[in-house]
């Protein structure tokens, strides 16, 4: 009550901030008349003037009014588009490192030019992040005309482009690309063997288009670069044959072999199911005779394959979650309906689905590098984003990314009509109503966009419309190539467009069809009269569609997130145009069945409803929205859970990547190598000659043999110590250190100091990369089973942190030993031989990256489903703390505390490796 009273008196925080920004808008507008008088050359010279001001110490904030005014005037001259006042506000919000919520059709692409231009003046690079390659190339080409005119360079990055071209694109003032490409290039750069092989020059400022799609929807899917692992594909096929012999239970208590947790996306074997599975596995010869338990240590691989096969059959549907094309299983993005060619689910799930569909099973992969979008985008020194729908996720943006959401007013009032949901008993009644609505719109000349949640439904609707002889277009993963054309025509009178889950997002649907598209199709020699005739015809179509009610949106199912529903609705009513929307639901829809059906069924029974009857009531809509909020909270918990685990990996990743950067930047690492060698020798001597021990406990022959076998150093220790009095462990360590130092000095003298320095760097990088790769595999195994610690009354996350730290420390100790042993064993005789070795290694990395898979990690890959259940049993408040938001990852100083959490200084802990 007090909050609402204060809001009425002083306005909301959003309103107060808008008032502050409006005062800056007035300053920008005051400069317009003066800038309009400038010649093109004088206006273009402003860019050089701004750059000089920045070098002289002037801040970007001080430059903002004039820079925005220059960008607006340049846009008017080059693109024929002048920024509205609300677009200036949107640009300021983006510059301030916030999220601008702007409705569809408000010109987000044009808004971005303002902060992009201003921040690119600093010369550190600006990344404009889009959801697909088509939008990246389109926006780079279109807006690139403006930036180039103003004297700034523009690049675009996409998969498969030549190395030198990609380096040039990242070297440009402004770089366009997808979130995946920026992420994978970051990981690739941290696998590079020299500075010259790296693409990026640091992550300074990013503007994320459709920020909710990238930072929320895709936050559960880490980016993974993986290479082939040594795993037999035959086992997937053999285990797959067993699944049809297992019986699915209706629920956890019912009879059968396994039950499906649709909320947690998990499949669980019952006690009976375990016995039945063991019996079938024995019959198939997969479990050997004498193996009395499926869960015996030697059978963990079989359990892994069985779980993957169960999930493939029970949770993943063809033409919903994936399609089969050209003998391959191709993932369908659940949020956009697009295919994700080249992406593979991990943890053996993709192979299990291949076995289920009877297509060739490809080898399982080993993780080489990975990062979540959450941690990738938190590396940027400044981050901002724009979307039509962010306010419903404002808490998540603030708590995870430290990003505040500001709602930007529309240029014209929204007049779209959002009708109440219509709820039916079953799907057939629902789709009959949908078809009638579509036919009614088509007859009246009103364009209609039908949003579906899967390819299967879109094709079913298409078949019904074809039989009814209703002309229509289908936009889903299978028609990706025609996407822009279909969207451009979706606003034509009577046009019917079926779109899978917001595919085509990023292109406005213009009432009457896209005028630009029609003009572009004109003959290059067309006269002004021809162009006028085309524009007149378009105006007639535009007015006819407005008179028919504008674009009508039909939703065939509620999505898990209200935001996705709002995105679909937001396609209508752009820039003050008329429009309408309605969702058609049934009790058989996934969301209704899992979360909302009981209450609605009760209402329907009380009302005596029969098949074909419909409920249209705001109370039902509110109940459904409550169900959606439940799912949103559940999905937030999963994303937060993923982040909690990945934050552990992220601290380790930062240490390893920081060390790689130091290695690549350093001219010489001789001091580091000497320090590591002495530490390794001390540990080796202590192993055979323990401190404070008597000589009877020493194993001098073992020490001598190890130095010979691992180091190639013949050191007759026993003879050297004969006749000496008061020999202790410290004296022996000194003798060994001295001998090894002389041995290394002799090797350096024989091949030359320069070659030795190059060899040290090469060996350190190679061994560190190999150790990190093996550590990632170990962490994967740890993560997959960590939820089981909950049964031992232990906190899985705390156990994961503890064991991850121990594993990381062991990995670094192993790296130290292996580096010194490798340097002792490698035989290099000349600089030419060293150069050949480096080139071979570089080619191997290039080949590995070409053969690698760029994957989406399966959402439950962090034990999320199991742990989410165990977290619900905790006392209130446990595990609820919000992680501190880290927006930047500065270089760790040698005297700073080590990021691993040991409490030691960095130089005495993990910094010692480099």
From Swiss-Prot:
Keywords: ATP-binding, Cell inner membrane, Cell membrane, Cytoplasm, Membrane, Metal-binding, Nucleotide-binding, Protein transport, Translocase, Translocation, Transport, Zinc. GO terms for molecular function: ATP binding; metal ion binding; protein-exporting ATPase activity. It catalyses: ATP + H2O + cellular proteinSide 1 = ADP + phosphate + cellular proteinSide 2. GO terms for cellular component: cell envelope Sec protein transport complex; cytosol; plasma membrane. Its cofactor is Zn(2+). Its EC number is 7.4.2.8. InterPro entries: Helicase_ATP-bd (IPR014001), Helicase_C-like (IPR001650), P-loop_NTPase (IPR027417), SEC_C_motif (IPR004027), SecA (IPR000185), SecA_CS (IPR020937), SecA_DEAD (IPR011115), SecA_motor_DEAD (IPR014018). Pfam families: P-loop_SecA, SEC-C, SecA_DEAD, SecA_PP_bind, SecA_SW. The keyword Isomerase does not apply. It is a peripheral membrane protein. Monomer and homodimer. Part of the essential Sec protein translocation apparatus which comprises SecA, SecYEG and auxiliary proteins SecDF-YajC and YidC. PANTHER family: CHLOROPLAST PROTEIN-TRANSPORTING ATPASE, SECA INNER MEMBRANE COMPONENT OF SEC PROTEIN SECRETION SYSTEM. Part of the Sec protein translocase complex. Interacts with the SecYEG preprotein conducting channel. Has a central role in coupling the hydrolysis of ATP to the transfer of proteins into and across the cell membrane, serving both as a receptor for the preprotein-SecB complex and as an ATP-driven molecular motor driving the stepwise translocation of polypeptide chains across the membrane. Belongs to the SecA family. NCBIfam families: PRK12904.1, secA. This is Protein translocase subunit SecA. The lineage of its organism: Bacteria, Pseudomonadati, Pseudomonadota, Gammaproteobacteria, Lysobacterales. The gene is secA.
